[in-house]
Amino acid sequence: MIFKFSQKALVALYLVVGLAEAVPSKSRVVSRASTFDYNGIVRGVNIGGWLVLEPWITPSIFDNAGDAAVDEWTLTATLGQDQAKAVLSQHWSTFITQDDFQQIAQAGMNHVRIPIGYWAVSSLPDEPYVDGQLEYLDNAISWAREAGLKVVIDLHGAPGSQNGFDNSGRKGPIAWQQGDTVSQTVDAFRALAERYLPQSDVVTAIEALNEPNIPGGVSEAGLRDYYNQIADVVRQIDPDTSVFLSDGFLSTESWNGFKTGEDVVMDTHHYEMFDNYLISLDIDGHVKSACDFGKQIEGSDKPVVVGEWSGAVTDCTKHLNGKGVSTRYQGEYANNVKYGDCANTTQGSVADLSDQERTDTRRFIEAQLDAYEGKNGWLFWTWKTEGAPGWDMQDLLANGVFPSPLTDRQFPNQCA
């Protein structure tokens, strides 16, 4: 999650040139009775921080493990196999339950996106990770079926790390595409696909890989080749399953002409706190930026789902930039200027926000809902946290800041 939008900004200059010729804003994928039509509207939420840990979503787990635990790799290495398995099993069994899926459905969602790491299905020698996640993913599929929700299974971490972020399992240098890491990723993906794609009444899509970081050094040509391999795996197992492809921090239009008409959906992510310009905006600026992004993705020749976004406009949340890393907003990160004061907003509830903060958050969320439904919808990041109000859909819904019903608008026509 770190630097997501700022890295997108790095490539903005060349994204506007050399693009494919103009195409309709929506192209058709074949509709099938047993699956979801991704030419329609996805309304859903990510189950983040559950089967792949992130320090800012569950800071207590990482804080209790000591300073060295900054991602799932170092957490499990610090705790050791036995203690790590005990800690994670307790987390997996309590953080998300069937009741969460019922709440998500009752709020009007039709999808959940569930991140999973390669280590859950394909352990490699000399790695500290523990497994056991698949039992809970199995439960989640059953819970989704009972709740009437569709599932996107998201391969969130690859061997070597595809982005260098803690949400890949291991932060630091990007080593994916080195050695055997791509073939190892394909093997892990195939294991997931063989286990879950036959349940096509619920698992209607699977994501090839979350946020491969092209600006950070991932080869675009190599990524396209990997995507071709993944599509072949899916078609061999279940030709009716749609494949989500990350834009790799490029524009969705830069992927025009690639696998168009092959039941693929572009996944793009939009955050406004990981970029020095965006974090400086007032609420009017944030609304305009979200609306502009919605117009930008309309140029894709494939369905586009904004697969991650939030109601946050600062990086004040504890550990958001990484455990022990400071904030841009307060001018403490990478020689930033100061844009404001985090005050008591590093952790807490939506109920703790001021009236103005709740109003601004609601306005920003509504703008994004309208913008992203101009194409093919959205998946909010994330359902639940230990106290990150701009990111916690469950808490936002409970406090009337996330629209309920989803079409309710206190600030209509912001993107008109």
Swiss-Prot record:
Residues spanning the signal sequence: 1-22
Residues carrying covalently attached carbohydrate according to the record: 344
Keyword field contains Transcription regulation: no
GO cellular component: cell surface; extracellular region
S-S pairs: 291-415, 316-342
UniProt GO BP: cell wall organization; glucan catabolic process
EC number: 3.2.1.58
PANTHER family in UniProt: GLUCAN 1,3-BETA-GLUCOSIDASE I_II-RELATED, GLUCAN ENDO-1,6-BETA-GLUCOSIDASE B
Subunit structure: Monomer.
Family label: Belongs to the glycosyl hydrolase 5 (cellulase A) family.
Protein name, entry field: Probable glucan 1,3-beta-glucosidase A
Natural source organism: Aspergillus fumigatus (strain CBS 144.89 / FGSC A1163 / CEA10)
